[in-house]
Curated annotation (Swiss-Prot):
This is Large ribosomal subunit protein uL30. Pfam families: Ribosomal_L30. The keyword Ribosomal protein applies. NCBIfam families: rpmD_bact. Belongs to the universal ribosomal protein uL30 family. Part of the 50S ribosomal subunit.
Amino acid sequence: MTLKRSVIGRPKNQVETVKALGLKKIGDSRELADTPAIRGMIKTVQHLVEVEA
């Protein structure tokens, strides 16, 4: 997963979700386990991140 858009001006819950996913700056990437909790977090910020299968 890669952060593609900035969290500046986004609601607090979206900013905290991006942090919880381990993303800090635009372009940061992480490989995460495919769990229901992670999927829920991705759904919350799907407009800010790009997910590669």
